Each structure stands twice: as structure tokens, then as C-alpha cells.
Amino acid sequence: MGQKINPNGFRLGITTDHVSHWFADSHKEGQRYADFLKEDVKIRELMTTGMERAGISKVEIERTRDRVRVDIHTARPGIVIGRRGAEADRIRGELEKLTGKQIQLNILEVKNPETDAQLVAQGVAEQLASRVAFRRAMKKAIQSAMRAGAQGIRIQCSGRLGGAEMSRSEFYREGRVPLHTLRANIDFGKFEAKTTFGRIGVKVWIYKGDLTAKELAAKEAAQPSGRGRGGERRGGGERRRRNDRAERAPRQENAGAGAETPAAAPAEGGNA
């Protein structure tokens, strides 16, 4: 299961979080769940088209009643901001035109791009599009990630590798990448390289270590859960059942004594 599923969705609520934060319960046109979802997809498509050189890792979206907050995580914030903020103003204007709401645009820098799975996948894809040998590109990215502090990394390329007529998949791995361990902090990213032979898919898994018991407890405490109340109800039920048994014991004895008395009467009548 852990080998096939997307690691981000598999660990959602444990080590990862949603990239869209909003709630939709309206049935009005333009305010339904499907409308917000389509809008999120268009916002992310707008961020990726024409911004390949910016190294955008992820786009987080948060909605309020009349405002949309967009957080852009990028390895090169200067390209996104532009000269004197011209590029940021252009992006904000396009987003306001798309959503029809006020946009709060935040541009955040990725501190360690060598251990960001999405940025590593984009870097390998750019090298493949520039006709760099795929094995060389993969091994170079692995070495950079391990030097930057990653505990394990796996890179997989799928497609017509090296211009071969039949497509295949190859992967290289270094260190540990425990895909089945839920507390493992695994970053996952994917990207497509457009080459003259067709598209080559690049997938990257980066293992950054396990969450400690204290960190897991803090995350569980932050999430609302009814387990504690349920446990108390079960405990109280057990106590009540024990008390009921203690109260029923003398009743069963009395019932037994009462049953012997009417049984003796027919016996006497029979002898008579």
C-alpha cells in the first residue's frame, strides 16, 4: 500500500497538511465546493505557466468571505517579485481577475531547495529537457540532497529514456526511504520533462527523518478527537455493569428460595 499511494495523501493529518484551507457549505452559484475547487486548480495552473524558472515548490490557498490568500513557496523569490514588485503586481492582478475577490499574495522563500522533492524533480526534468543523460542527472540530484542533510532519497524516471523505442522505468536510491512508516516525514514531488522523444515523468521521494513521540503527541493534541470521552463512557459502563451484578446476586438467591417453596406443595398434594 505504501509503495503505490501518494505519500502526501497517505500521511495527511500525521506529517503533512492540506494545501487548501477553506470551507464551502453554500449552494449559491460561484460559492459551491466544486466552484472553489475549480478556482484552486486554475490558480495553480496560472502559477506554473510562465514561471518555470522561478522554482515554485507549492502554492497554498486560504479563503475567507471576501478575500483569498495565496502563499507561493519558491526557491527564487526575486523572479516572482520582479523589478520593483512589477511581476508580483501582475500576478495579483491576474488572480483578482480570475477570482473576483481581493488577493493577499505572500511570497515565501524555500530555505533548502536541495531537499525539496518538488524542486528536485523540476531540476532533473530541466536537465532531461536539455539532453543531459538521465542517469547523470539522477545521481547528481541524489548527491546534492544527501549532502544537504536528507536521510534518504529515491528518484524514478519513466518514459523513452535515452531515446529508446520502448519506454521503461529506472530508479536510483540512497539511504532509507520507509514508505510504510506513517510517522516518517517523506516529501514527494513529480514533474514531466518535455523532450524530443516524448514526455519523461520524474518522481522524487525524500526521507527527512521520523517525527518523535513528543511531536506526534503535540499534533494529536492539536487535532479535535472524541477518543477521551468515548473511553470514559466505556469505563463508566463497565463500573455500572459490575455494580448491577453485585445487586442482582441476592435477588437470584431469593428467587431460588421462592422457587423451592411452590415445588414442595404439589409433592405433598400428590402423597395425599
From Swiss-Prot:
Keywords: Ribonucleoprotein, Ribosomal protein, RNA-binding, rRNA-binding. Residues 253-272 have a biased composition (Low complexity). The keyword Ribonucleoprotein applies. GO terms for cellular component: cytosolic small ribosomal subunit. Residues 229-238 have a biased composition (Basic and acidic residues). The keyword RNA-binding applies. InterPro entries: KH_dom (IPR004087), KH_dom-like_a/b (IPR015946), KH_dom_type_2 (IPR004044), KH_sf_prok-type (IPR009019), Ribosomal_S3_C_sf (IPR036419), Ribosomal_uS3_bac-typ (IPR005704), Ribosomal_uS3_C (IPR001351), Ribosomal_uS3_CS (IPR018280). GO terms for biological process: translation. GO terms for molecular function: mRNA binding; rRNA binding; structural constituent of ribosome. Residues 218-272 are annotated as: Disordered. Residues 43-111 form the KH type-2 domain. Pfam families: KH_2, Ribosomal_S3_C. NCBIfam families: rpsC_bact. Belongs to the universal ribosomal protein uS3 family. Binds the lower part of the 30S subunit head. Binds mRNA in the 70S ribosome, positioning it for translation. Part of the 30S ribosomal subunit. Forms a tight complex with proteins S10 and S14. This is Small ribosomal subunit protein uS3. It comes from Micrococcus luteus (strain ATCC 4698 / DSM 20030 / JCM 1464 / CCM 169 / CCUG 5858 / IAM 1056 / NBRC 3333 / NCIMB 9278 / NCTC 2665 / VKM Ac-2230). The gene is rpsC.
